[in-house]
Amino acid sequence: PAIERGLAITAGQPVTVDDTWEQPWGERRFIRNHYNEWRVTYAERSGLQRRVDVVFRLYDDGLGFRYEFPDQPALKTVRIGSEITEFNLAENGEALWCPAWEWNREEYLYSRTPVDAVGSAQTPMTVKGRSGLHVSIHEAACIDYAGMNLRRSEGTSFRAQLTPGLTNAAVVRQAPFNTPWRTLQISDSAAGLIDSSLILNLNEPNKLGDVSWFKPMKYVGVWWEMHLEL
């Protein structure tokens, strides 16, 4: 049965982390990882007494949140048909977005429209408010999980929509596991979004060991050549 009713909500104490890690290569060698974390637990008051944690990490340049399914006797296999994650934008700003769920291909050119003209969008979707504030909605650490698109539900509100699986469930995982981070990068300018390290910080650390043999290269993909008729 779904975990959705008769839930008790408890919140832990905020935790602050401030450290620095080194990239094997990239725009910057050292990345500062500075955030405040807050964990909220939702637990069934009766019955199976299953629990789900929602973890928030707040950075100077935005925030990320994810759902965590701890190891517990009454929850072994988790089947996720959809998420009820929503993003409610305060105003009808200007959106830079690429369509999702079109019938003939996955890649499209980006459109620049009012937010309420968006139907379904791939992420990242970027919105510029009337004050010039920029917000980019995306995800991080998407590992063994369905990709997230956005479908406008009404007005300037969007709901996360998972890429379908082969069954009724978009995701089937064994507990314990975590969903990807849902991310909001926030900046006073578009350039500030490019400078943000939020998604890098929320991605999983390197698990490959020695990666010194990785070498940066330039690559031109065939699909973009077709788009540009090269």
Predicted features along the sequence, with ranges:
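Structural preference for beta-strand elements that scaffold enzyme active sites
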Residues: 180, 217-221
